[in-house]
Amino acid sequence: MPYVSTADHTQLYYKDWGHGRPVVLLHGWPLSADSWDDQALALANAGYRVIAYDRRGFGRSSQPWNGYDYDTLADDLRAVLKECLVSEGTLVGFSMGGGEVARYMTKYNGAGLVQAGLIASIVPYKLKTPDNPHGSDEKLLDETLAGIQEDRPKFFAEFFEKFYGVDKAEKPVSKELLQWSLNVAMQAGLKATLACMESIFKTDFRPDLASFKVPTLIIHGTADQNVSIDASARPAALGIRNSKLIEYEGSPHGLLATDKQRVIDHLLAFLKG
């Protein structure tokens, strides 16, 4: 299996499909690059080179003790882009992966990129503060960390029902997809799972928005129960120049599965545009 070695010798598993202009896909918490497979296959079949990797601590990548802050995660992303010789690429982050996109824009000035995408992303700020009233209470972070440590399988079984909007969907995802998601989440290291959730809540990407210098597609569901659209996509669209926001009315957080064809169609249109 192909791996990239990072600055601290962490081994990152990646898949490299197809040929053409590169598209790099960053997965969400607590999944792996496999969560992008439907979109990756469609983009590769459409004539693009698709690169997706497992974040450190997740999937098939190494599980180091340190390095789950967004500065290090942006360094990991840079290592993948350099190893794969990415130029004139499109970088798309889902959920937690949106943070890596934002921090990469600031830390590396978007090197090698001509487009960006944020899908159900946490950007710009997850935590509720006086100047970010639509964010999530820190109490939710505490409850999440406690729930994971008390009974991780039970926590994630309940988490994914909300993630995919099972209780609100006219056509819920299958129980098999829920089980698969749980299986993938349990591949991640416990330290990575906890530390990344803290980074998701506590990293303020609002200063990074000005660093986006490329056309940026933003997609978000209006019924997202995990990342409020009012704390993420809408302010991100206001803060990122040359961005386009597409709202999926009534859709939950797990858009890559619940709205997979619509995401594929919008990505292809964006890439061709």
Residue ranges and their predicted role:
Residues 1-24, 45-48, 86-87, 241-246, ...:
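Alpha/beta-hydrolase fold catalytic core
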Residues 8-66:
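Conserved HGGG/HGGXW glycine-rich cap/lid loop of the alpha/beta-hydrolase fold
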Residues 27-29, 89, 93-95:
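Conserved alpha/beta-hydrolase "nucleophile elbow" surrounding the catalytic nucleophile
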Residues 72-89:
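Conserved acidic catalytic loop of the alpha/beta-hydrolase fold
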Residues 102-107, 111-150:
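Flexible "cap/lid" loop of the alpha/beta hydrolase fold
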Residues 124-127, 131-136, 147-210:
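Conserved alpha/beta-hydrolase catalytic His-Asp/Glu region
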Residues 211-251, 259:
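Conserved loop-alpha-helix segment in the C-terminal half of the alpha/beta-hydrolase fold
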Residues 257-269:
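Post-His helix in hydrolase/transferase enzymes
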